[in-house]
Amino acid sequence: MMWWFLLIGLASAAATASSASSASFESRCQHFHKEIHLQNVHVLSTTYVPIGSNIPMVYNPPICGGTASSSISTIQFCQVALNVTTSDKSQFFMEAWLPSNYTGRFLSTGNGGLNGCVSYADMVYATQYGFATIGTNNGHFGDTGQYFLNNPEVIEDFAYRALHTGTVVGKALTKLFYPQGYKNSYYLGCSTGGRQGWKSIQRFPDDFDGVVAGAPAINFVNLCSWGSRFLKITGPPGSETFVTSAQWSAVHNEILRQCDALDGAVDGIIEDTDLCQPVFETLLCNSTAVDKTSCLTGVQANTVNEVFSAMYGLDGKWLYPRMQPGSELAASFIYYSGNGFKYSDDWYKYVVYNDSNWGHSTWTLADAAAAAAQDPFQISSFDGNISGFQKAGGKVLHYHGLEDAIITSDSSKAYYKHVADTMGLSPSELDHFYRLFPISGMGHCSPGTGAASIGQGSSTYAGDDPQDNVLMAIVQWVEKGIAPEYVRGSKMSRDGTIDYRRKHCKYPKRNRYVGPGKYTDENAWKCV
C-alpha cells in the first residue's frame, strides 16, 4: 500500500487540470510546447505517454542503450525533451516527465561514471510516485571523457552546471504545466549522482529540500588518482607483484575468517568494516606448497597490504582512504586486473593533461598532485561547510554500501567526519539535517550479499514504507519532520520475494548481533 502521505492531494486530483480525464491530459501535453518560452531552451518534443505503452526513448543514443532502455509506463505522463544551451561551445540534453498523478513534488535524477546518459530507470521510478521528474545527459552523451578534450565548458557542465541549470529549467516547466506549481523539491542519485547531490548541497543549497545521495564520488579528483594507483600497486599480470583472481578469492575468505564474527554473527557479511583490520601473513605460501593459487608470496602479501592502505601524497598528506575489506571479489576485476581503470584514465587524458595519448602506465604521485591542484570547477565536491543547506532547512540522507568495489565506503565516512569537524558539530547536532547510513552487504549502488535493497531505485524496490525506501524516507523527513533512525534493507530472492530484512544503523553507530533469533531476524540486531 502506498504510504499515506504520498497520496495527499490525490483525492481531489480529478478536479485539477493536471489529472483530469486522459483526453484532456493528452491535449494539455500535446499543446504544452506552445507555452515554453525559456531563455536558452530549445524544445525538441512534447509527447503524451499513456498507461501501458512503451516509453519513447527516441533521443537516447546507442552508446547509452538506445531504445532498448525503454520500459512500459505504469502511469500517464507528458514527456518533454529539450536542449539547453550553456555557452557557445556547450549544451545539455534533458527530459522532464510530468505525470497525471502529480503530488506537488519535483525531483531531479543524477548520472553515473563520466556519463553522459539520462538515468531513465530513476526517472521511471520517481515518476510513478507522482514526482515531476527531470534527468539530463550532464553535458554530453556517452560514458567517456573524450568530450572533455579541449572543452572546459563541457567539463563545467559535468561538474555542476547541467544539474543546476536543468533543475532551474525543470522547476520552471513544472510551474508552467501544473497550476499549483510544486511544494517541495528532491534529488535522487548514486555514484557520480551522489557527488552531484553533494555538489548541489554545497554550491546551490536552495535547489533541493531533500537529497538522497548514495555512494558519492566526492573527493572526485583524488578518487580518480586512487583508481590509477592500483595499477602501480599490482603491476601487470605475470609480474611478481600481481595477485590473481583465484588468490583474491583466498584473500576474501581470509578476511571473512578474521572479520565476519566481529559483529557477533557468522553470516558472510561484515557489518562494520572499521573493525576489520586483517593480517595477510596468514596466507603466506610455505616451502612445500604445491597449489599456490590459495596462498601468497611475500611480495604479493605486500601488494594486498598496500591495496588496503590509504593513499598519501608526495608531501605525506592524506589524499584518499583505503579500500574497505569485503569488496575484493568484485574489485579484483575492476581495479586489480592489471589493466588500469577507464574512468581514471579518461580523466587524466582528457582533463588533467588534455592529451589523448597520455598512458596510465606512467602514473605517479606527482600526477596526483597535478590533478589535485587543478580540480576544475571544484569538481572534487569535498567542501565540509554545508551551513547554507542547513540554514535553508534542507535534509540529506547519505548511504554507502560496505561492499562497494568502485568507491570505498570509507570515503563517505571521511566526508561525514570532515563536515563534523568543519562545522564543529556533534553527530546528534548533524542529525537535524544530515544522516549517513553505511549499508552492509551492498555493492556499488546495488545489492550485494546482504539485505541491501533499500528502495533507491526500481531494481531495489522492497515496499513503500519509509523504513524500507530511502526515497519515501526523505519525503517523510522533509514534509513530516520524521527523520530516519535506521534504513531497513531487504535481501531479495531470485523470484522477487524477501528472504530477510536487516536494519542498517545511522553512523557512527554500528550493528551488533545480540540474538536470540537467527541472524536473519531483524530484531536480533541492535545499533550500538
UniProtKB/Swiss-Prot annotation:
**Glycosylated residues?**
83, 101, 286, 354, 385
Which top EC class is given? Answer: hydrolase
Cystine bridges: which residues?
A: 29-78, 64-117, 190-445, 259-276, 285-295, 505-527
| Principal subcellular localisation of the protein | secreted
> Catalytic residues per the record?
191 (acyl-ester intermediate), 404 (charge relay system), 444 (charge relay system)
* InterPro entries per the UniProt record, alphabetical: AB_hydrolase_fold, Tannase/feruloyl_esterase
Q: Where is the signal peptide?
A: 1-19
The subcellular localization recorded is: Secreted
GO annotations under biological process? xylan catabolic process
Q: Where does Ca(2+) bind?
A: 260, 263, 265, 267, 269
Molecular functions per Gene Ontology:
carboxylic ester hydrolase activity; feruloyl esterase activity; metal ion binding
Catalytic function, reaction form:
feruloyl-polysaccharide + H2O = ferulate + polysaccharide
- Keyword Secreted listed: yes
Q: Its Enzyme Commission number?
A: 3.1.1.73
What domain of life?
Answer: Eukaryota
A GO cellular component term found in this entry reads: extracellular region
Instruction: Give the protein's biological function.
Output: Involved in degradation of plant cell walls. Hydrolyzes the feruloyl-arabinose ester bond in arabinoxylans as well as the feruloyl-galactose and feruloyl-arabinose ester bonds in pectin.
What's the family? Belongs to the tannase family.
The name of this protein is Probable feruloyl esterase B-1
Per UniProt, what is the name of the gene that codes for the protein in this document?
A: faeB-1
